[in-house]
């Protein structure tokens, strides 16, 4: 077995598993496609892996979650005259705003989410390097990521939590004190926090359901899973006090 490939029903979200049956992250598939195309500008939501900025010689633009925001970011890059513009979402759905040439073949812009390009690019990466997909993935050295959500989480409580965390640095520091110290923050979509030890935690209310989502990154899978549990516990504790 070399790989398992599939897609969702309308073919815009790819799935690629390695020789062990382990799925590769969607944002990694998008990054592999960027290398395949020789892209210069990557547009991707804030929920895609934070290691993308250091994974190659790209200019990276972060957006809110959703393909319309990625498309808007690509269009802005084109308007600025920037070459080699493409985008992808954390699910691996890939879009291109520029024309690319690969092995003498022109690939015209496809500014709508697609799964076929990242699947082909990933299989090509394995074949060209004569490596297994697991080794191709390991070569990118992206932080380990995990995510989960709290369902039936009132929109009012989500709003109250976000307002509380954004109200002051001391509020945020006190909320996150059980897990670490704040280094940097981003509020592009929800609130993403880089901790001083290099880990990341991101709280984001769902845009279309009564859910609170939590995304984390760490140096190891076990650290990521532990941080995710802690993050969700912090949200639950806030919800209890807000009642």
What label would you give each PLM region?
Residues 13-30, 97-98:
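Short Gly/Thr/Asp-enriched flexible loops that form oxyanion-binding sites at enzyme active sites
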Residues 31-39:
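A conserved helix-loop-strand patch within extracytoplasmic ligand-binding domains
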């Amino acid at each position: 077995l070399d790989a398992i490939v599939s897609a969702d029903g309308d073919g815009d979200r790819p799935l690629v598993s390695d020789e062990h049956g382990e799925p590769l992250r969607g944002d990694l598939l998008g990054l592999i496609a960027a290398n395949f195309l020789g892209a210069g500008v990557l547009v991707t939501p804030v929920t895609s892996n934070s290691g993308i900025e250091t994974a190659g010689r790209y200019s990276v633009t972060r957006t809110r979650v959703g393909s319309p925001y990625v498309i808007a970011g690509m269009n802005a890059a084109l308007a600025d005259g920037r070459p080699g513009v493409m985008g992808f979402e954390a699910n691996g759905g890939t879009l291109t705003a520029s024309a690319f040439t690969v092995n003498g073949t022109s690939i015209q812009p496809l500014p709508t989410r697609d799964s076929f390009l990242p699947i082909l690019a990933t299989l090509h990466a394995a074949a060209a390097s004569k490596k297994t997909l697991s080794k191709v993935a390991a070569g990118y050295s992206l932080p380990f990521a995990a995510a989960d959500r709290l369902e039936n989480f009132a929109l009012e409580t989500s709003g109250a939590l976000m307002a509380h965390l954004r109200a002051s640095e001391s509020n945020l520091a006190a909320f996150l004190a059980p897990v670490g110290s704040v280094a940097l923050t981003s509020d592009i979509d929800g609130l993403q926090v880089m901790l001083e030890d290099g880990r990341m935690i991101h709280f984001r209310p769902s845009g279309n359901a009564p859910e609170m989502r939590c995304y984390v990154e760490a140096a190891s899978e076990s650290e990521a899973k532990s941080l995710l549990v802690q993050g969700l516990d912090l949200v639950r504790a806030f919800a209890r006090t807000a009642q």
